[in-house]
């Protein structure tokens, strides 16, 4: 299971689709609708959020925005904040649209989860995930590797490369991350 901290526009097709499926699974786990994956380390940051289901819904919403921009068909009806989907989607000064800066990314859409509090992600985690993504893309989609470089250049600093739900903070790789050498 990989729920990327990186902005969805940086993910190649396989990573975007897999992330969508795995985050839908995360939503099921948090709702108590499945017995599997309940202790998966990728769930830690969502469980720590004051509104975990709303955070997952905000995350999924941005994945769906990127899918729409690419002409993919992700079923938004599968996104739900919980038993009362019509309820509040969070509060606070932070917004799940904070990192909306790149013309190559699907950031401009209205987000119904914009008031969900951001999740901190250490810069070291982003660096690791970007290196991991580059490694994966180099082996499976060299054409995307070129697009990835262009999109990274357009975003500028690495802190602008986070998924809009995440706020980049100083720090190393998350303790829950199972790192690989590549």
Specify the residue positions occupied by each region the protein language model found.
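Short beta-strand
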Residues: 35-37
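Sequence termini and other peripheral, non-core segments
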Residues: 1-16, 22-25, 29-33, 47-88, ...
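Conserved, mostly hydrophobic/aromatic
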Residues: 40
